[in-house]
Amino acid sequence: MVWLGIDLGDARVGLALSDPELTLAHPIGNIQVYGDSFRALDEVIDVIGDESVDHVVIGLPLLLNGEEGKSAKKARRWSVNLEKRLHAAVEDESYSVTRVPTIELVDERLTTVTAHHQLFDARIGGRKHRPMVDQQSAVVILQTALDRSRE
């Protein structure tokens, strides 16, 4: 099994994959979206097919009080669109997707802060830091889901 973690950002969508044993998440990159995360759907579908992803974990950016704001509603719309596009991709031979994976939204409060701390702890700063935050946030989101799945 392989899980995919997704952090929806305004400039980039960060991606992370699990190992087949579902113990560790690792970054696989970003997709530039230039303010429109819906532009990333086809590339995410390609990753799902190419990596034979069984489960997708999407960060749900709740407000600190636990309520859903504008960004959380956007993440929900994005996940619904991903699922619809995946169903269509399964029928379309030009995609390598053979089945629709489970899609899960998880609370991502403070994951960006955690990602920043992890990058600083790894002595990654300056220009290298900014583009890595989204994929590191995806790692935090996915690792949290992986750890929770073993409880």
Curated annotation (Swiss-Prot):
It is found in: Cytoplasm. Keywords: Cytoplasm, Hydrolase, Nuclease, Ribosome biogenesis. GO terms for biological process: rRNA 5'-end processing. It is an enzyme of class 3 (hydrolase). The keyword Membrane does not apply. One of its GO terms (cellular component) is cytosol. Its EC number is 3.1.-.-. Pfam families: RuvX. One of its GO terms (molecular function) is nuclease activity. It comes from the Bacteria. HAMAP family: Nuclease_YqgF. Could be a nuclease involved in processing of the 5'-end of pre-16S rRNA. Belongs to the YqgF nuclease family. NCBIfam families: RNAse_H_YqgF. This is Putative pre-16S rRNA nuclease.
